[in-house]
Amino acid sequence: MSMTDPIADMLTRIRNAGMAKHQKVDIPSSNLKVSLANLLRNEGFIKNYKVIADNKQGVLRVYLKYIDEKDPVINEIKRISKPGGRVYVDSDGIPKVKNGLGVAVLSTSKGIITDKTARELGVGGELLCTVW
């Protein structure tokens, strides 16, 4: 079955696994998803991730992070730019998520970066999702 929005699928799997208190979640892998998982790890939203080869596209295993072993660190993870309605922002139009407590994730010419990094570099791009 073809998937129209693999990033939304990844975010939904992470959100559902967090609500179900799972320690890890397996997601079909791609370069974009690995970049997004790397950014989430660097920002402290997930413990870690690893790519497992399975002679097809591979599996991205994401290890979730919890506060006091019960509440997920990710309170909300939301897809912004969708296949049916892409959302592009310039460096001046990058939104602050929860007054700077959260992170907006952008796909730019410099790669997958956070809103803070995009402002520092003065670049805009496609607003993939917000996390807090």
From Swiss-Prot:
Which biological process annotations from GO are given for this protein?
A: translation
Q: Which UniProt keywords apply?
A: Ribonucleoprotein, Ribosomal protein, RNA-binding, rRNA-binding
Name the domain of life: Bacteria
Can the keyword Ribosomal protein be found in this entry's annotation? yes
Output the InterPro entries linked to this UniProt entry: Ribosomal_uS8, Ribosomal_uS8_CS, Ribosomal_uS8_sf
Q: Which GO terms describe its cellular component?
A: ribonucleoprotein complex; ribosome
Q: What does this protein do?
A: One of the primary rRNA binding proteins, it binds directly to 16S rRNA central domain where it helps coordinate assembly of the platform of the 30S subunit.
Q: How does it assemble?
A: Part of the 30S ribosomal subunit. Contacts proteins S5 and S12.
Question: Which family would the database say this protein is a member of?
Answer: Belongs to the universal ribosomal protein uS8 family.
The protein in question is named Small ribosomal subunit protein uS8
* UniProt organism field: Geotalea uraniireducens (strain Rf4)
